[in-house]
């Protein structure tokens, strides 16, 4: 698989992840804690794919790395909030599946940043 195919497939996965996360958050029972969790997780979870997409229009190699780094930070934050969701709502099976998928995004972003930095030298 070439870089463009990999990027397209990863972005498609991120779009599906964001849609699934949105559906999950809307299905949670109402509570004050849910509102905070829903807000934080919704923001960070959707930001991963948005920043990854934006990296495709980077103006330089350094800008590309910067945008991927932002996506990684958001993926790490999403990991935290998904962990909270799994603890607060262990009955929600979809949360664990999304947690695993997000962890894959963390690994992809870490490797992409590492490769881009190596190619920058």
Regions found by a protein language model. Give the residues of each.
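Amphipathic alpha-helical assembly/interaction segments
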Residues: 1-121
